[in-house]
Curated annotation (Swiss-Prot):
GO terms for molecular function: substance K receptor activity. Its main location: membrane. One of its GO terms (biological process) is positive regulation of flagellated sperm motility. A lipid is attached at C324 (S-palmitoyl cysteine). It is found in: Cell membrane. Glycans are attached at N19. This is Substance-K receptor.
Length: 390
């Protein structure tokens, strides 16, 4: 069976020759290349530095090692690798239209982008599920550390399986003396296999998880925002606990919306290309692709900024991480925020949450007399509370 080269993430630009100039139709002026290189370099530096800092903040401070934050580590790791590998090397390939990096890295370049995207969005989905159980069903058993690690490993394995077809059909070709890294799909009567693959990828790593997260965060929002705190406790630990949960949910909703907005044009671009493949041969397509690819890759750099702006513990962590900078002055409060164990008074106050939820109609009497309440404040280690209550 014959094969034909199909445009994909690693072979988006074909090696068309210009009859007038003798150079590739996708050559660009040096000043334009310099602007794009600056934009991509800034993206990679911000994404790698920000996500590496997020990983350090969680791993270096025991108080930050929660189930939710382990999924955030997984998300940050996928984003860091996406920026360091996919954004960097694919930009060089798309801007020069020559593959410089050999056959082995061609396989990797067609395997890793889909893998990282899957890991990113399903880490967000796992966070949404964890928050849903903690807030909507606070008395159900929470994920243990081994279960969390198993889920993370499962996400990576499924992601690799989903990306494997592109890796399997990857190959190196030489066109007019220029080396290309392409995905050569089997000839399947008009590219039906390619269209099916793109649609499956779109559903599994975009539409379906976004739909699940939309439903989860809608229920979480309704649960939190209808929850009232009795007037005599309106300025106590219960109110702070509720406000912390709301702020964390807002941050994660913003993370999900950012991902959705950044990646939608990129997905639509490839789906459109399966119906009208000739668009890839227009001269302007290089600039369109570089813009859409930059927008998609930029999703890797926004999350650390969101965490820093909307979460006080991550903000303290960033101050500590960049304390060598002259304009950053961490305080003792920042250090205590990440290392200090909550005081006994705060733990006792949190014990009264059961009574508060029962008084506001958020739980039944049987729920108010058994089990634990909710989840710890964002960033605090989960642990038994109220055991001494009689």
């Amino acid at each position: 069976m014959g094969t034909r080269a199909i445009v994909s993430d690693a072979n988006i630009l074909s090696g068309l020759e210009s009859n007038a100039t003798g150079v590739t139709a996708f050559s660009m002026p040096g000043w334009q290349l310099a602007l794009w290189a600056t934009a991509y370099l800034a993206l990679v530096l911000v994404a790698v530095t920000g996500n590496a800092t997020v990983i350090w903040i969680i791993l270096a401070h025991e108080r930050m090692r929660t189930v939710t934050n382990y999924f955030i580590i997984n998300l940050a790791l996928a984003d860091l690798c996406m920026a360091a590998f996919n954004a960097t090397f694919n930009f060089i390939y798309a801007s020069h239209n020559i593959w410089y990096f050999g056959r082995a890295f061609c396989y990797f370049q067609n395997l890793f982008p889909i893998t990282a995207m899957f890991v990113s969005i399903y880490s967000m989905t796992a966070i949404a599920a964890d928050r849903y159980m903690a807030i909507v069903h606070p008395f159900q058993p929470r994920l243990s550390a081994p279960s969390t690690k198993a889920i993370i490993a499962g996400i990576w394995l499924v992601a690799l399986a989903l990306a494997s077809p592109q890796c399997f059909y990857s190959t190196i070709t030489v066109d007019e003396g220029a080396t290309k890294c392409v995905v050569a799909w089997p000839n399947d009567n008009g590219g039906k296999m390619l269209l099916l693959y793109h649609l499956v990828v779109f559903v599994l790593i975009y539409f379906l998880p976004l739909l699940v997260m939309f439903g989860a965060y809608s229920v979480i929002g309704l649960t939190l925002w209808k929850r009232a705190v009795p007037r005599h406790q309106a300025h106590g630990a219960n109110l702070r606990h509720l406000q912390a949960k709301k702020k964390f949910v807002k941050a994660m909703v913003l993370v999900v919306l950012t991902f959705a907005i950044c990646w939608l044009p990129y997905h639509l671009y490839f789906i459109l290309g399966t119906f009208q493949e000739d668009i890839y041969y227009h001269k302007f397509i290089q600039q369109v692709y570089l813009a859409l690819f930059w927008l998609a890759m930029s999703s890797t750099m926004y999350n650390p900024i969101i965490y820093c702006c909307l979460n006080h513990r991550f903000r303290s962590g960033f101050r500590l991480a960049f304390r060598c900078c002259p304009w950053v002055t961490p305080t003792e409060e920042d250090r205590l925020e990440l290392t200090h164990t909550p005081s006994l008074s705060r733990r006792v106050n949190r014990c009264h949450t059961k009574e508060t939820l029962f008084m506001t109609g958020d739980m039944t009497h049987s729920e108010a007399t058994n089990g634990q309440v909710g989840s710890p404040q964002d960033g605090e280690p989960a642990g038994p509370i109220c055991k001494a209550q009689a």
